[in-house]
Every structure is written in structure tokens, then in C-alpha cells.
Swiss-Prot record:
tRNA processing in keyword set: no
Protein name: Probable septum site-determining protein MinC
Gene3D superfamilies the record matches: 2.160.20.70, 3.30.70.260
Stated family: Belongs to the MinC family.
InterPro entries referenced in this protein's UniProt entry, alphabetically: CAP/MinC_C, MinC, MinC_C_sf, MinC_N, Septum_form_inhib_MinC_C
Keywords: Cell cycle, Cell division, Septation
Described purpose of this protein according to its UniProt entry: Cell division inhibitor that blocks the formation of polar Z ring septums. Rapidly oscillates between the poles of the cell to destabilize FtsZ filaments that have formed before they mature into polar Z rings. Prevents FtsZ polymerization.
Domain of life (superkingdom): Bacteria
Subunit structure: Interacts with MinD and FtsZ.
Length: 221
């Protein structure tokens, strides 16, 4: 029996959510450009859902916002939290209306395997631990990326980018002997360097999710 030419199947994906808190697009873009400059490759071509729940009026120029984001090579897949008027504008612009999903009561499965790297990760290098944790005995340099579907443990300085829970595992953590990262991310929630500096003083720490926000805890000496 021949296979059908198409199939419709359910699937879940981890998307970054851009929260717009002001209808002043010049101010929004100035702040966004500052964040993009800190981690340009991380956001390049990244699919985004735009959250408009903080905009309780209809004065936002959604068409202009879409054009400004596209000009920065960001891909808008839809909006969420919009007023009725803005939702209609979004549909006219070909954007999907995304409803927030319910939190699953079933905990994510434990990582099935661990990838161990016994060397420094240098600028331009990327290491990915699929379906498991990543343990690095060494430093992660500026411009390097380490990614894991599970947790990331770095027995050295983290100066590049670390993305744990890449497949959506919200229980994943990032542990490093020195937190100096350009970017850290767990299940799509991320901090740039400036956010990390507000919560850490370049010392050892454990970054985890607390609800939908990241937090950092000191490690016992």
C-alpha cells in the first residue's frame, strides 16, 4: 500500500516568546537591537511568538512591528495575548493566533544518556548532547556554544552560550564553576550577559527555572 502524499500529526516545539510592553516601537527596537547585538547568532532566523498581553489598547502598529522584526531576520510565527482588534490585524497580516498551552502534569522523562567532553570548548565550536545531559571538564570560551536536551554541567568557566532543556525539559539546570556567560537558556527561557550579571558575580552557580523565569543559586563550597 502506497504512503499518502501528506500526513497531519500533532507535535510540540519550543519557541522563544518576545514580550512587547510598549507601543513605542522606537523604544522597543532600541532595546531589542541592544539584546540582539549581544547574541546575534542565537536570534538569527529564530521563530518567535509575540506576546501582546501588556498592550491593553489598540494603538500598536502591528504591521510596522512585523516589518521591523523581519528586517532583523526574526521569524514571527504568531501572536498571543492580543486584544480583539489587534488579533484581527494579526490575521489580516497572515499571523497565527497562538493560545498558551496548559502545563503538563506529567514530569519530563529523565535524560537517557550523558555526553562527557574532557577539553575546553573554543570560540566557534558547538557541542550538542541529544536526549541527555552534557558534562564538560574544561572551560566554554567566548563565542562557543554548548547545548543539551538535559542539563549542562561545566567544571570550568562558562564564557560562551549554554542552552539546556533544548527539547523543552523545564527541569534541566546549568551548573558552572564560573558564570560569565554571553547567554544562558533553559527550555527557551533565556538570560543575556546583562541579566546574568544582575543575579551573579561570576562565581559558581546553578541556573534553573522557577516557573517561567530563570534563577541562579549559589553552589556549596
Amino acid at each position: 500500500m502506497s504512503k499518502p502524499s501528506l500526513e497531519l500529526k500533532g507535535a510540540s516545539f519550543t519557541l522563544s516568546v518576545l514580550h512587547i510592553n510598549s507601543s513605542d516601537l522606537q523604544a522597543v527596537m532600541t532595546e531589542l537591537d541592544s539584546k540582539l547585538a549581544q547574541a546575534p547568532q542565537f536570534f538569527l532566523g529564530a521563530p518567535l511568538v509575540v506576546n501582546l498581553s501588556a498592550i491593553q489598547h489598540d494603538s500598536l502598529n502591528l504591521s510596522a512591528l512585523k516589518d521591523l522584526l523581519i528586517s532583523r531576520q526574526l521569524v514571527i510565527v504568531g501572536i498571543t495575548g492580543a486584544t480583539t482588534v489587534l488579533s484581527k490585524q494579526a490575521k489580516d497580516l497572515g499571523l497565527a493566533i497562538v493560545k498558551a498551552g496548559k502545563q503538563s502534569s506529567t514530569p519530563p522523562p529523565a535524560p537517557r544518556q550523558t555526553k562527557i567532553v574532557k577539553q575546553n570548548i573554543r570560540s566557534g565550536q558547538q557541542v550538542y548532547a541529544k536526549n541527555g545531559d552534557l558534562i564538560i571538564f574544561g572551560a566554554v570560551g567566548n563565542g562557543a556554544e554548548v547545548i543539551a536536551d538535559g542539563s549542562i554541567h561545566i567544571y570550568g568557566a562558562l564564557r560562551g552560550k549554554a542552552m539546556a532543556g533544548a527539547a523543552g525539559d523545564t527541569s534541566a539546570v546549568i551548573i558552572a564553576h564560573s558564570l560569565e556567560a554571553e547567554l544562558v537558556s533553559i527550555a527557551g527561557q533565556y538570560w543575556l550577559a546583562e541579566n546574568l550579571q544582575q543575579h551573579s558575580s561570576d562565581k559558581s552557580g546553578c541556573i534553573r527555572l522557577d516557573g517561567e523565569s530563570l534563577m541562579v543559586e549559589s553552589l556549596p563550597l
